[in-house]
Amino acid sequence: FSKNVKSISSYCPEKTIISTGLSKWCGAGGWRLGYFIIPDELNNIKNMINVLASETFSAVSAPIQYAAIKAYENDHSNYITKSVNILSAVGKYVFSNLKSNKVLINEPHGGFYLMPEFLNNKFKTSSEMCKDILNNTGVALLPGSDFGFNPDKMLARLSFTDFDGQEFMNNIDETKKIDENLINKFAPKVVEGVNKLKNWSENL
């Protein structure tokens, strides 16, 4: 969110493979069209990826291809600036309101995910814990074990994007500070989810 992050490609471009796509770069969840940028020095890897891809993927659907043309041919700096400002504000809101002596969580510096750790001795696995959270709060989290963490580590992946991004964007400009009132107005489900998670964790 600080816009000062340097990619490893700035230091070692000849050995850096960049992968990205519409769903992450544009915040267009489910619009799966991705690509690799591979330096000439790694042509052998590029050739192997081409072989694997040709045997693995079918063609991208036509609507996504047309969306990609628009996404990549126009200047979207205003859209990106607004997106970053919204995600930064909402992410920091979730961090500030969820952290406690029972929830360890790092402040987000980019993206739209958090990985809180819920300190408790009630559950044996993070999967069991996430099922309990879903059943008792209606909040859906993915267990840390899905991302390679030990099952007994009570981690969960949380996405803070359950809001209408277009409506949010239409009601702010690049200079407007996004405060708690705006988050309550345009991201009410996120606010509700945080409150439910906080109450759940406090009653463990």
How would you label these PLM feature ranges?
Residues 1-7:
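Conserved PLP phosphate-binding loop immediately N-terminal to the Schiff-base lysine helix
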Residues 9-85, 95-98, 176-180, 194-195:
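Conserved core segment of the aminotransferase class I/II
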Residues 16, 103, 139:
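Short, conserved active-site loop motifs that form the nucleotide-linked donor/cofactor pocket
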Residues 22-23, 102-103, 144-148:
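Short, solvent-exposed loop/turn elements at beta->coil junctions and helix N-caps
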Residues 69, 85-95, 105-118, 152-154:
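Conserved glycine-rich beta-strand-loop-beta hairpin in the small C-terminal domain of fold type I
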